[in-house]
Structure formats: C-alpha cells, structure tokens
Amino acid sequence: MIIFLKKYKSKIALIVFICVLVCTVSCLLDFKTLGKQKMPGLEKKSVFMAAENTVAKNTDKAVNEPRLHAVSAALYDADDETFIYGRNMRDSMANASTTKLLTCIVALEKADINDTVTISQNAASQPAVKLGLVAGNSYNMKDLLYGMMLESFNDCAYAIAEHVGGSTEGFAKLMNEKANEIGCLGTYFITPNGLDAENDISFHHSTAGDLCVIMSYCAWKSPKSTQFLEITQTMQYTFETEEGQMVFNNHNRLLTETDYCISGKTGFTTKAGYCYVAAVEKDGRRMCLSLLGCGWPNNKNYKWDDAKSLVEYAVSDAAEDSYCDAACVTTQQ
C-alpha cells in the first residue's frame, strides 16, 4: 500500500485539486443564481427599505422641517389635494372645538342665516365656555354662528344643532354624512361643540389629515364658503339681545400675527389638549394646517408657535419641493 501511494502520489494530488476546483465553481454559480431569485421575505424587506429610502429623500428635501409640540399635525395643499407634511396625521384623536368648523358649514348649507332659533333647556345647560343662552328665548341664527366661531360658545353650537337637525343626534348624522361626502373617513362626530363623548359606535374624534380637508372645504369649496370666511375673519361682532348688548371677540391670533392666515378655529378639552386648524394663502397658493394634542394647560401658546412654524414651512421653498402623497407620514418623531 505504501509503495502504491508513493507511486501515484502526484496523480492523487491532481485528482483532489480538480475535485476541489469543481466544487468551488459549482458553489459560486449556485450563489449567483440564488441572488437573482425573489426569495420569500427578502422581497418584502426590500419594499420596506425602499419606503424608508423615500422617506429619507423627503427628509433631505425638507431641510427646514418644522419642530412641533403637537402629538398630531398635518399640512395640506388645498389645490393639489396632497399632504405636504404629516405627523401621526391618520391617528384618531379627540379634536375639541375644531369640530365647530363642520358644525358651522353644515348649518350654513342646511339653514337660513336669518332663521330665528328658540333655545331649549338642553342647549341652555351646556357647560362653559358658553354665552349664557336663556331657555325659551329666541335668537338669530347669524348671532349664534358668530358666538360659536369667534368665542367658541358651546350653548350656541347646541342651539344651532337642534334647530338644523331637529336634535343633536340628527345633526351629528348630518355632520358625519358631510364628512364622508368630502372624503373624511377618519372622522366621527357625536357632539356639535366638540366636547368629549362616546356611544356604542365610537368616541368623538377626527384626524389631523381630515381636519385639513374639512377646513379646505369650509374655506374654498363649499357653496357657503364666502359666508364662512366672513364669519371667521371678523375680529369683533356686536349685537343686541333681550339680555343686553353682546360683544364677541375673535380668538384666532394668527389672523393678526401673520400675513397668510385667512381662517381658523381653536379648541381645548382635557382629553384633546390644545388644538388648532387654519387656512392660509400665499401668492394664490391655498393651504390648510392642523394641530392636535398641542400641549395641555400651562402650554397654551404651543399651538401658536407650532402653527407659525407650519405657516413658515408652508410658504418656504422647502414645502414647495417636498410634496408627498395622501399617505404622508412624518419623518420626525
């Protein structure tokens, strides 16, 4: 055996070398082929990575991306109907008195602004903030609309809802139908004034994205947009009642603190925090912004700071170059 191995040593070595070479080449060819195949799991991961890359590109474009306090926020181009910026903009959240945007436009579309409204005990007993409507007394619809939109009076909202819808439940149905009609499928309203409530279906809520669309409809697309803007742009409104002269002051600070704001509505409940929705215009470019959960007591001015940041972003070159689609999600956490 030893003699045999010595005799054929060189041939055995050659055979071993050839075998190793063949195996190596075969493995390399298999690996190359495997790399071209769409392997389960890897394909999904690549799609996810592509989405991450898209977000990263948007981040690169949005050099001046706003830094916000709000839990949820959105910035919307009303003409292109696309979202420019979003933070948790599809999350269902309590939205407080920003609800009154839809209350106002539904009332304007369904009733006459000169209607006489008789106040029920239910409307008169609404909690603050309230005008102090007296049950059994009558008021002009126009005066109630100004009270609701300028001072955010809860009793005015209830009186309007009962007059237009026959009941607050009937009016809520009209509100939700309008929300669905304009594409706001993440909105479900129970109360006309935005106070927190729940029923067997859900809780009173909207989304930052939906509120931008609602504001866009109110300000520019409703057949009653002109009346809506006239009401929400009025800085002070005075009228006479059986109880004496009433003076309402507009609480939308951005009307006077920026050159771009043309309408807006504030809101607050313990659950919702401070909220704000606004419409802005710049050189014919129409946009809406919304902020939900923008601080709680002791942080009342956060909404103004955030709104100004979004307004500045809206009219900056960064916003003009950073459009995203309706599924827009923020890259800022």
Where is each model-derived feature located?
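Active-site-adjacent loops and short helices of periplasmic peptidoglycan-processing enzymes
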Residues: 2, 35-209, 219-221
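N-terminal secretory targeting signals
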Residues: 1-72, 316-333
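Generic secondary-structure transition motif, activating predominantly at the C-termini of alpha-helices
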Residues: 9, 149-152, 179, 183, ...
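Domain-terminus/edge residues, biased toward the C-terminal soluble/receptor-binding domains
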Residues: 26-29, 184-185, 200-333
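Hydrophobic alpha-helical segments and their boundary regions
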Residues: 15, 19, 125, 168, ...
